[in-house]
Amino acid sequence: MVREEVAGSTQTLQWKCVESRVDSKRLYYGRFILSPLRKGQADTVGIALRRALLGEIEGTCITRAKFGSVPHEYSTIAGIEESVQEILLNLKEIVLRSNLYGVRDASICVKGPRYITAQDIILPPSVEIVDTAQPIANLTEPIDFCIDLQIKRDRGYQTELRKNYQDGSYPIDAESMPVRNVNYSIFSCGNGNEKHEILFLEIWTNGSLTPKEALYEASRNLIDLFLPFLHAEEEGTSFEENKNRFTPPLFTFQKRLTNLKKNKKGIPLNCIFIDQLELTSRTYNCLKRANIHTLLDLLSKTEEDLLRIDSFRMEDRKHIWDTLEKHLPIDLLKNKLSF
């Protein structure tokens, strides 16, 4: 993030697309401006939009391929230049555009010798290919080559366990992320009480949607996220109505753990989030990447489980232990904590 002093005038809050271009079929660029914002607001909006753009925008991609009787993904098929793994990687790069929901079937069925490109994929009517020239494989001999594909619309990065499938079906680690990158910069304008901020937002997409469409969808997702809070009072929401549902009080981490010591039932461990453990950013990010979100998740892990987490170190383990040992009852540590 860059901060720079520039001249400007106060005006009604508005946004505008100041630059838009198509670098290639799979690379669109857009630059947007939002102003005037009060001091600190540009950061708030910039961070929220960046996260929503990178993590909340849905995309369509190929998630599975079935070759027939192929023993493993490192196999080679007679008459095809690429290995099965290389073909899977090429299929992973195919950019699709659609509004479908759920899983759809597609296929490739060609006869060599010839090059196979994305144009050869037989798709359902609701799906289209962004770049039909994307390569898939090269058939060097006159063979019949068929692949059954599965297509799914999702968000984020989806992975599946690698294993041999007897029917020749292999998962593809799907990148359902149409937004390739997002940058924002903040410029300060004016002097004294007239000082305000201008937010510049840069968005790169893979061509399945434009940066303007991505910005619209991200903004809509953020609005939908906060709508329940706006309607809570109108709908007369009362937590007393949900007597069977546990509602955690707004305590600090220390107060919650003190409650655990005083009350045998205490607060459910799945209602204490690791955000409240006052961990270092590095340790916190390691746990988040391993889908450890609550104290219950953490206490369910062994030392071996934690050390298998990417970039997790013994210092992180000691830091977590010191924090828990300071606040948790000893008997709970013995019963729950495996390290």
UniProtKB/Swiss-Prot annotation:
Its EC number is 2.7.7.6. GO terms for biological process: DNA-templated transcription. Residues 264-339 are annotated as: Alpha C-terminal domain (alpha-CTD). GO terms for molecular function: DNA binding; DNA-directed RNA polymerase activity; protein dimerization activity. SUPFAM superfamilies: C-terminal domain of RNA polymerase alpha subunit, Insert subdomain of RNA polymerase alpha subunit, RBP11-like subunits of RNA polymerase. Signal peptide: none annotated. The keyword Transcription applies. CDD domains: RNAP_alpha_NTD (cd06928). Its main location: plastid. It is found in: Plastid, Chloroplast. Keywords: Chloroplast, DNA-directed RNA polymerase, Nucleotidyltransferase, Plastid, Transcription, Transferase. GO terms for cellular component: chloroplast; DNA-directed RNA polymerase complex; mitochondrion. Residues 1-233 are annotated as: Alpha N-terminal domain (alpha-NTD). DNA-dependent RNA polymerase catalyzes the transcription of DNA into RNA using the four ribonucleoside triphosphates as substrates. In plastids the minimal PEP RNA polymerase catalytic core is composed of four subunits: alpha, beta, beta', and beta''. When a (nuclear-encoded) sigma factor is associated with the core the holoenzyme is formed, which can initiate transcription. The N-terminal domain is essential for RNAP assembly and basal transcription, whereas the C-terminal domain is involved in interaction with transcriptional regulators and with upstream promoter elements. This is DNA-directed RNA polymerase subunit alpha. It comes from Elymus hystrix (Eastern bottlebrush grass).
